[in-house]
């Protein structure tokens, strides 16, 4: 009985640490994005709330939460309420297997990579439910686009991750990092890194692949009918996934935190800055161009890379 109580308390504290850490990370990721984009566009960015604008995310979050929650009359109220909670919950669950040290992880799972692939594949359900429950044509089209986009690019991303698993000989995230003590995987698998980066942009609905929430076409897309806490949960889920993808790319190709925690954090921030750089640089793709790129360009190249990695491993052995 005491052991069970200890496990429950330990699990609750770990979950609380993950949630608080994630909220702080998302807050500063949004501030970093606004500062970097301001610098690229030769302007100041937020600099009024707090020292050099450091408290701006807190002010924005409080303003958003304190606003009135407006539920459309024609919406399916239960599913409308569940959708943002589901999206945010999935983004938190994904973080449970991310190591914060070589021997320090909240949920040590031997097949951590498979766990991430499985959970991330159901992340689209929150967006689809939001689009359907809002009973709005713009939200519904945004949900459909998101479903098609994630299915199209998860195949290519899955093949690249299979290539990493094959090359490393393990599906454990910590062991993948340990295998990069001498040589980072980005050196032998540079084409795979480029494809994984493009797929990560698409999976997180980031520009130039932000078709599900294209303002010019869908008036913010799947979350057009959401306000206050619902909108905030979608926002938190989206940025939590962006940070997760930045960390995963660092773990898979740059060695993660295997040598130094500070260096590992810098790698993750560097990947996050590359997401921001792409947003500030490239225009949005058309929907047909997005589908063409996914099925006729990325998928064949990902398959070739996977075959090449298998051949390389067989030759080495």
UniProtKB/Swiss-Prot annotation:
Bilayer-crossing regions: 7-27, 46-66, 78-98, 113-133, 151-171, 183-203, 239-259, 262-282, 296-316
Annotated GO biological process: aerobic respiration
PROSITE patterns membership: COMPLEX1_ND1_1, COMPLEX1_ND1_2
GO cellular component assignments: mitochondrial inner membrane; respiratory chain complex I
Keywords recorded for this protein, A-Z: Electron transport, Membrane, Mitochondrion, Mitochondrion inner membrane, NAD, Respiratory chain, Translocase, Transmembrane, Transmembrane helix, Transport, Ubiquinone
Entry EC no(s): 7.1.1.2
Protein's membrane topology: Multi-pass membrane protein
InterPro entries, per the entry: NADH_UbQ_OxRdtase_su1/FPO, NADH_UbQ_OxRdtase_su1_CS
Catalytic reaction equation(s): a ubiquinone + NADH + 5 H(+)(in) = a ubiquinol + NAD(+) + 4 H(+)(out)
Molecular function terms from GO: NADH dehydrogenase (ubiquinone) activity
Domain of life according to the entry: Eukaryota
EC category: translocase
Similarity annotation: Belongs to the complex I subunit 1 family.
PANTHER family, A to Z: NADH DEHYDROGENASE SUBUNIT 1 (PTHR11432), NADH-UBIQUINONE OXIDOREDUCTASE CHAIN 1 (PTHR11432:SF3)
Function description: Core subunit of the mitochondrial membrane respiratory chain NADH dehydrogenase (Complex I) that is believed to belong to the minimal assembly required for catalysis. Complex I functions in the transfer of electrons from NADH to the respiratory chain. The immediate electron acceptor for the enzyme is believed to be ubiquinone.
This protein's name: NADH-ubiquinone oxidoreductase chain 1
Organism in which the protein naturally occurs: Dictyostelium discoideum (Social amoeba)
Gene coding for it: nad1
């Amino acid at each position: 009985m005491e052991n069970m109580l200890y496990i429950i308390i330990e699990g609750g504290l770990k979950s609380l640490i993950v949630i608080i850490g994630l909220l702080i990370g998302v807050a500063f990721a949004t501030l970093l994005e606004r500062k970097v984009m301001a610098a690229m566009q030769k302007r100041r960015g937020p600099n009024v709330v707090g020292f050099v604008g450091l408290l701006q995310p807190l002010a924005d979050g409080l303003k958003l939460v304190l606003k009135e929650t407006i539920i459309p009359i024609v919406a399916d109220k239960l599913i409308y309420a569940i959708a943002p909670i589901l999206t945010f919950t999935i983004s938190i669950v994904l973080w449970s297997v991310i190591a914060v040290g070589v021997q320090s992880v909240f949920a040590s799972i031997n097949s951590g990579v498979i766990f991430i692939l499985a959970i991330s594949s159901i992340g689209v359900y929150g967006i689809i439910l939001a689009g359907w429950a809002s009973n709005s044509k713009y939200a519904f089209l945004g949900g459909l686009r998101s479903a098609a986009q994630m299915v199209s690019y998860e195949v290519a991303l899955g093949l690249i991750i299979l290539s990493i698993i094959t090359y490393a000989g393990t599906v454990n995230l910590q062991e993948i990092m340990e295998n990069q003590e001498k040589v980072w995987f980005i050196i032998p698998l540079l084409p795979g890194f480029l494809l994984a980066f493009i797929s990560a942009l698409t999976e997180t609905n980031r520009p130039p692949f932000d078709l599900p929430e294209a303002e010019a076409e869908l008036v913010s897309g799947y979350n057009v009918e959401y306000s206050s806490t619902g909108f905030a949960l979608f926002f938190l889920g989206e940025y939590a996934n962006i940070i997760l993808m930045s960390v995963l790319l660092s773990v898979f190709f740059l060695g993660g935190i295997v040598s130094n925690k500070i260096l590992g954090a810098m790698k993750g921030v560097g990947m996050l800055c590359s997401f921001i750089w792409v947003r500030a640089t490239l225009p949005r793709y058309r929907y047909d161009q997005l589908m063409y790129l996914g099925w006729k360009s990325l998928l064949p190249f990902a398959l070739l890379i996977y075959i090449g990695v298998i051949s390389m491993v067989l030759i080495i052995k």
